[in-house]
Amino acid sequence: MRILNQITARLSTVALASVLSLTYVQAQDTKTDSEGSDKEEGNRNVMLNASSANGPREIQIGLPSADVNVLDNGLPVTYATNPHSINSNWRSDASLSHVGLLKISETAITTGNIGYAVNSFTQLGQEGFNGRLDYKSNHFGLQEFSLNLNGSMGKGWYYSTSLYQDFDPGTFKIKSTPFQDRTQIYKAALTKRYGDGRGEFTAMYHYSNSHPVYNYATQSAPFIYVGDGSVKEYGDFRLGTTSYLPTENNITYRDMRTGQLKQTTLYDAIENHSSEVSLMNTYKWDNGLTWKIIGRYDNARGALVYQTPMSLINVKDNNSYNYVLRGVDGQLTPYTGEYVQTRMSCLNSGDIDELLFTSELSKKFSTSTLRVGVNEWYYDIDYTSNTTMYDQSVPSDGSYPVRVYDSNKHSGFFYDFNKNASEYYKGHENKLALYLTHDWDITPKFNVYYGARFEWQSLRGENAAVKNSNGEYVGRFADYYIGATAPDGTKITPTPLSYDWFNYDFTAALTYRLTDNFGLTGDFTYIVQHPRFENFSPATLPNTDKISVPLGRAGIYYNNSWLSLTSLFSYISKTNNNSTLNLQHDGEIMAAPLTYDIQTIGWTTDVMAHPIKGLDIHFLFTYQKPTYKKYETSVTFSDGYEGKINATGNIVAEIPQVLIEFDPSYMITKDLKIWTSFRYFSKTYANINEAYYFNGHWETFGGLNWQVNKKLSLGCTVVNFLNQTGAKGSIAGAELITKDEAKQYNGHLMTGSYLRPFTVEFSASLKF
């Protein structure tokens, strides 16, 4: 969890003003009785993703995201995304009848989570026989198929079946497996519809099996940091199309539960599977009262694997190292390369049982809608993260890296089992919540929306935050496991956990139409949470004080026959973010837990225009300033060096202060559409101390969509058509580097994440 916390808290920390970038405010929504309705944002394709070929894009709100919020039929796809990720259990495919984006206020009230939520619904059976077959490919060899068949069986009974198959080799070949994503999902639903349109009852089964190898295969790559915000490629290594993953697929680890040394493959370690049973019922009365209820049980194995780059060592002509590699004949030979990359392998996995239940009762009046809902969500997990260190070559000729080891220190490839970032927790978490909302048109010009959520959260179980006889945390050490003995003589036994908290959320939005075209709007959401079970995975207990998130927005909107404009100022903050940094010094890794706050102010202007027939233009401009508050921590390394970080007042790492989106599209004919999408991200800092930075870059998309006839549609999409290459995100092992120290590393080799390469995608959809 330490590595996941660090990645999530920094890579997912994003700018506030994009809260508004999902565009129209409530005053501009068109209310319908559809699945999406006025609870959703418009104007944004959440599946147009520059970071992934098969997942929804990250929705930016200016805070470290605890989880990606994706709802399926009103329930979270997974209760927690570590170790059971969204993409391993859900795809936007032919099995869905609707995919939208819930507003922040709706997400907060109905789930208690922070941020937008992708909102999806299953395609249930319809009259007659119906089918939809979707296909997608790209020039790297992706093969993705999705099929839904549904129909009627008579007497009000309907069926729906779906399958999804993904064979994705990624943008570069790896030796350990032919695919960087091998996912299969199957669904079957049986629906009974009541007479007179009263509603329906559905029973559904869902099975998924996924190996998201891309999670670790695309995690990092080497590049030369120039010093002016740009990077150069290292020799013949091509960012995004050359593999930085060693050829070997096996991994040795020490089981956190038993202490046994075990061996597996990375492909097997990242296997996810899930078996779900869902029951859904909707009933409508003549007086406008509607009752919706859904329950789901999920038995799953969740897994995430990280191959996190740590130290990058120049070993050329350095006699203190004696790195060797093993040939195909088993013989050891000296390693003659210039650099060695140390990696921490994190094998996260857990056996999971989820029982999620939501019930809503709503009543429509002439000028308002009142809703009352209940959540009862139960989550049981037995989780470990087994960690292993190993070293690899850093080839400059574009060849595959191989594992190496320093024979002066080790006798094999793997070492420091569970010393860094190993994790353990077992038990259950329960959330019982009552929520209500009221959407009221007080006058034809004045709308008020308000709501509240009251949540009882309980947590019972155990973890491995062990203290010694002096009351000090033991921390992790080499060959750590439950039952081991620490260097100071402390026996490692699980620490019992028992917590009960009261959480609450409030939201209110006001919209006033000054004229038929112009108006004022504002909204405020206040969320109070407490730590979730996964926050108890490190070697120290988290700060269990309340986490408060106030979000306020205010501005104007203007609409006419060809233009819609929204301009708003925003503020959001979050207290008591729990995180753990893995700080590095002279090849040693030390965990540094900390609790910090974040504050973001921003301004967003969003325009949707239809200047001439067939031409649509969307433009978004965001300025934001996300800053750390109370961000201080330190650790003392074995040589006595004290590593300190004080980032209070710094701009949040990896977050641009300026974002621009420009999305024009034109209907060449009534069946042929050409479109482009440009997204600009300004300069971002690549470490917490603002010592390294990356220049701004564009993410670009373009495509042609052809509706051949009523049954068949074809599409071609080009990702990164400007063919920009370079680095993004953070630089591995750079947390302690200061601005003054950074200058000496200009022109040095470093590792980090990178932009998605130029990709041509083809798609087809057939309805029958």
Model regions and ranges:
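Repeated loop/turn-to-beta-strand initiation elements of outer-membrane beta-barrel proteins
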Residues: 130, 156-159, 196-201, 288-291, ...
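Solvent-exposed loop segments that connect transmembrane elements
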Residues: 215-261, 305-345, 391-420, 460-497, ...
